Amino acid sequence: MCDNTANLIKARYVVTSTSSEQALNWQALQPELSITELSAEKADFWSLQKHATKAISLFLKQPRRSLLVLKADDQAEYADLLAEFIRQEQPKERSVFGVNYVVEQGDSFSFPRIDTEPAQSLADNFAAQGDVLKALHADQFSLFGSVRVHPSSQDILLTPGLVHQANGGVLILSAATMLSQFDLWQRLKHILQTQTFDWYSAHPFKTLPCDIPSYPLNLKVVILGNRTEIATLGELEEDLYSLADYAEIESYYSVAQPNAQENWANYVLALASKYELDLDLTALNKLYQLLVRESEDRFLISISPLKTTEMLLNAATLSQKQTLSAVDFEQAFKQKNEQHGFLRERTYADILNEQIYVETNGEIVGQINGLSVIEYPGTPVCFGEPSRISCLVQFGDGEVVDVERKNELAGNLHGKGMMISEACLASILELPSQLPFSASLVFEQSYGEIDGDSASLAIFSVLVSALSDLPLPQNIAITGTIDQFGLVHAVGGVNDKIEGFFTICQRRGLTGKQGVIIPATTIQQLSLSDEVVEAVKNEQFFIYQVEDIYQTAKILFDRDLLEEKEEYAKGKEPIARLIQNRIAFRSETPKKSWLDFFKS
């Protein structure tokens, strides 16, 4: 997204009640499609894959390239779509490829003899006509054929494999098969490099019953795999990309422009029509909002046929209707949330029952509610949860103790965020290189491993509170990562984080003062639930967007962080002055007179 688009979003949706507060308007919390009417035109999946279709077409036309590595996530679904697309690209009239193996069986006095002759028709045993075949699971016999010997008569039977059946055409395989049986890849690579099929014994200690002639194979292979599988294959086969072309089936589609939104809508309507379903404009808009929640980007949404079809069928099954509206998709979304919500509800119950202490009212020095995302192994969902972060300060040798890191309960990214917060604070306040205080920072009642730097803005704020002895509002939770210059940057999971804190506040009772602080750069990630939107609309809950630590300090403390004017009213002094005065006071030591020397 270009800077102009980002600035337009901010200008449109920010409501500035004072110079320091930047509360988002409720319209900013859910994205809206710009299309106003539905088109009768339908679009297929490949109409949204201009890069992949061009790469595949060039690969099919290039006679000297026989291998294409194609990144694809939903391989089973994409294999069917890919095979159909390639068939449409192939010429309608195709020649017969391959050979006919003529087997002269042996007897007790002679060995069997096998010869080849050019295939004349598809009736010949190793004839093919340029078919497009796919096999996401294969072994050496299904892929390369087999040589069978009758146990009694010793007659030989040659059985063609997929490489023979796809001669003159295209064979679609999976990278997972190549990785699990790497010897298949080695033999397939040899076939593609030599354009010849050679027979080998399947048993390492037995030879073939007789000589079997090789024959030429005119074969193209497409290997489908996700990014991890392809990366592993590339590590095992260093020459992979000298042998293969590379392209990607894109899992996400940019809908930044109105014509792209229309293309996406036509694609969804085409998918729905396969199941005799129809969608009105509100349904398309709600589906778009749900996809934005998953991608965390209102300009880039998933176009996975598997995922989109699942959402369509879930809404249709639950509503028992053929024409779907926004209500049906919202109902399906809530049902799925409830279905996956056991651990989330238990966590929230612990907070509400004060088994986990999270304050949502009042003010406390050196304590803030950070926003985090919780993931449990064995579950497909994650959810937002407020985390109480506390800080105690003693004037000492400058050590800032990260209790989580010290006890090996935090990862490297968390440690990085902590160090950036310290460096930023020292730089902004012009403190000496050796900080004149010691501090301990704790994620209270956190018993599992934590990682990520999205709490660095919260850590900075709680350090400032403890140093200045200024209380922090407990009704405002915060997320964001900062750099050493104090700029606030984007984090992930913003929708889950906001909804997690909102749920706790809502169940305790909204006061009209509660809210969250998020980075301004995360506005395009927002696609919040209807409950949050309604609360913001009624001014019961607020979402503040900030660009730097100065705006953050203004919201949290209602003070300037640094000196911005010559005079300040009593009780409104800048935070930096309070911290420096406190450090100076603590640093002063009583002077001794020369008489004290004789008294000691």
What are these regions (language model features)?
Residues 2-18, 24-29, 54, 59, ...:
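Peripheral, non-AAA+ core regions of ATP-driven protein-machinery
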Residues 229-243, 529-535:
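Short regulatory helix/loop adjacent to the ATP-binding pocket of P-loop NTPases
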Residues 2-234, 246-257, 261, 265-281, ...:
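Conserved ASCE/P-loop NTPase catalytic core
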Residues 217, 242, 537-541:
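A short helix-to-beta-strand connector/capping loop
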Residues 390:
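Short, surface-exposed charged micro-motifs
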